[in-house]
């Protein structure tokens, strides 16, 4: 251990206490999600499974960052998806939304004006809306076809302000839905390899799908996983 760090005494202990408390709060938030998971999946999964277009994900701020990751995971695991920033959606980008699509709208408060407005627009177009919210009685939840409750007892940082535990639960919910869709569609390693030929994962999936690495995979950058 660095001697200067060890000599900090009280500051060192406060840092470690905050770190452990944050982790415990994140784990507790996932425990709450686990308790209500079956009902959540049974509500949203049929909407996603019936989608014949693309799964469009939207959000703003930290919810938007998480939404981008959810969309990327869906696309790489057999569910075509893309992300639209809610503000851009209200300035023309909603034109990318078509009949047959599903909109996943993420807002922890469920009151973010632009996200709600995009949700309302999608609903008027006949596009099913899945609301991912921390408040199930919010405006966004009320307009939705299905609601995913990602509420947490508190955020993981000391002030209980910065999106931390709530964004973790939201991202995990996206992973859960992607995994459920993979299982329903019998998505295979070969399917994954087709969508992800690059990086270490490309090499790994080539081995799983064909029994041996493909030379084409080695010619693509291995920086990404």
Label each region the model flagged:
Residues 35-38, 60, 186:
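Alpha-helix boundary/capping and short turn/kink residues
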Residues 49, 53-182:
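Glycine-rich phosphate-binding loops that contact phosphosugars or nucleotide phosphates
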